[in-house]
Amino acid sequence: MKKLIAIAALLISSVATFAQQPVGSFSIQPKVGLNIASLTKADDTDPRFGLVAGAEFMYQASDMLGVSFGALYSMQGCTGTTDELGKDVDVTLKLDYINIPILANVYVAPGFAVKLGLQPAFCINNKVKAKSGSNSAQTDGPDENTFDLSMPIGLSYEFSNFVIEGRYNFGLTKAFKDMDNKNSVFQFTVGYKLPL
């Protein structure tokens, strides 16, 4: 019986630890993490690993629903290797964006949220870097669409104000004006939620 009471007390304290923000409250969450970015219809390329960092604001509309929006600096694009005159050349397409995720956060269990929404974004950097041995060069990338739209889908886990999240951003619009490639980005972040 003592074991049963101890287990019940532990479960109750765990639920309290994982509780969301009070209904009607606002919070801000600075966050930082890793992007694994690629482009659709670019079969001979590899992902570009890059930084994602920024902050998201959330309104806790109910016990099960929060609505959030944010601003994130996001390093995207892809990498690859080509052969020029018998030498391997490593090529990196650097597409950097300011992403503005607008998400519904549905809490399916204490501390766990499923996230879905839309993400407008603005391209702020478009460069191609080529490197062979000790030689490197950089030039402007293909003619980009400065506005991008994607659909983020993710899962997050909250514990004592820390938020661990995995998200996939599915590109809805073309990244370039004259090509059909779209952004495809896996994103892993750690944040800290601060009540406002």
Label each residue range with its predicted role.
Residues 21-23, 60-62, 109, 159-162, ...:
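Outer-membrane beta-barrel channels and translocator barrels
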Residues 44-45, 108-128:
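A short beta-strand-loop micro-motif that forms or neighbors metal/cofactor-
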Residues 38-45, 75-96, 124-147, 174-181, ...:
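Flexible, solvent-exposed loop segments that connect beta-strands
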Residues 30-34, 51-59, 71-73, 100-106, ...:
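Residues on the lipid-exposed face of transmembrane beta-strands in outer-membrane beta-barrel proteins
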Residues 1-27, 31, 190, 194-196:
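Bacterial Sec-dependent N-terminal signal peptides
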